[in-house]
Amino acid sequence: MSNKIFTHSLPMRYADFPTLVDALDYAALGSAGMSFYDRRCQLEEELEYQTLKARAEAGAKRLLSLNLKKGDRVALIAETSSGFVEAFFACQYAGLVAVPLAIPMGVGQRDSWSAKLQGLLASCQPAAIITGDEWLPLVNAATHNNPELHVLSHAWFKALPEADVALQRPVPNDIAYLQYTSGSTRFPRGVIITHREVMANLRAISHDGIKLRPGDRCVSWLPFYHDMGLVGFLLTPVATQLSVDYLRTQDFAMRPLQWLKLISKNRGTVSVAPPFGYELCQRRVNEKDLAELDLSCWRVAGIGAEPISAEQLHQFAECFRQVNFDDKTFMPCYGLAENALAVSFSDEASGVVVNEVDRDILEYQGKAVAPDAETRAVSTFVNCGKALPEHGIEIRNEAGIPVAERVVGHICISGPSLMSGYFGDQISQDEIAATGWLDTGDLGYLLDGYLYVTGRIKDLIIIRGRNIWPQDIEYIAEQEPEIHSGDAIAFVTAQEKIILQIQCRISDEERRGQLIHALAARIQSEFGVTAAIDLLPPHSIPRTSSGKPARAEAKKRYQKAYAASLHVQESLA
């Protein structure tokens, strides 16, 4: 199949529309669209925005033929396909609430996914669920006790009759979709996002954050069930009339270099990934791959979704400098589903800007003080930019009082993109309506108005009044040549015992013992604390739907195993 390489053919508008429906209506007047690629980087399907609009309007009438009413939820298994996109926009035209849900993304996850899906469906109470054929058996198994739920494959959905009704356009305060959080610290919650809220974020992203241009072309492997994939690379291109190229997330995981090859092949200019995406490419690349790449076209290389390692990005930049990658294109950012997506972006063409602070002062006093001659060790944090226009960032203490710059505290946000609350949680909805602010659950500090994120509140390791960041301990493990980035996870137990779990591929017992002793010694030397090193088989570390390490789940599993071992010991006593 040949690629028409859709071009921008309309006067560019930066998401200045009242609803997602209005955004697609305008994009459909031009010739831009979406292209879907397989794992070999071969074009599978093209979907022009004018075609998407026609299919979405027809799909809306099909959904209404099921006697669904305005505000009903429609769960969508969010695979990277035109079927998902068409169903999502069909919900918008029908006045229904789309609920993108994750697909299984790893070895042996299908059984646990079915149980998780049951929980998500119980949470959002959808009237219908639409899925690709691959996931239909799992969906049927998860929904067999709910005979009133309409379970549809994409083919069955397209075969429904169209209701003979006039579509009622949504208004800005209508709910557009529920975005389930990744669940890094608790069971995922459904974030309520209205058309007004998402359009405010899309405008801020496109006009003030990334600063999109008419000639830009987006490339993404990010999943549509994650806010970076859904808002950043499905809704943003539509709202700015830009074309976008997609790889399936699972294909990227198997062949990460296909991401860079697609950027090079189609002269992509804007692409964003979590840090592990860059690390995977740098680890897997070889000389043959490099010979196929020219990354001079890449204008914005965004980074977000997890703590950002400057060293990791430096290694990527050094590796791909020979194929014209410019490290100034790096654009660290901060965001979360509760703000639709983005809160802040670093300055354009500034690259990765870091702030080094005295680690001891940080851990004992909670202040990000510049190192001096007396400094024993430093911690490094990445500049994630200033708040987007009309949005606010405050750092507050435990009492909710704003603190001075360089003081670490709770990152709190406000602005027109802030969610209406969590679905089914009236208290959260009332609190946001009353205050207009949200405590994100993240910790960080401001310096000259720029945000530096230090970690999650619930992940913080507190030992004898000292605050230790788990990523600092994990970083020590990841410096070992046999341990990859993301293969280590650190947490503290209820007994105040620090645990460092490592996915280890080393089979030699002597080498495993050496690794344990070396890491324990380094952690003792660096932090003055004792850590228990636990070597695990590959694929053992739990992750959220967005690929982040789920420290709370790892801790839960460890405590469960610990309790079981105590029970056995007591039984044998």
Question: Which role does the model predict for each range below?
Answer:
Residues 1-47, 51-66, 70, 94, ...:
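N-lobe entry segment of adenylate-forming
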Residues 20, 380-394, 398-406, 410-470:
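Conserved ATP-binding/catalytic segment of the ANL
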Residues 35-86, 106-115, 167-169, 190-199:
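Conserved AMP-binding/adenylate-forming core of the ANL superfamily
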Residues 32, 161-180, 186-187, 197, ...:
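Conserved pre-ATP/AMP-binding loop-to-beta segment of ANL
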Residues 268-272, 284-377, 392, 399-401:
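Gly/Ser/Thr-rich phosphate-binding loop
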Residues 487-491, 500, 520-573:
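Conserved C-terminal "lid"/linker of ANL adenylate-forming enzymes
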Residues 264, 271, 415, 420-421, ...:
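AMP-binding/adenylate-forming catalytic core of the ANL superfamily
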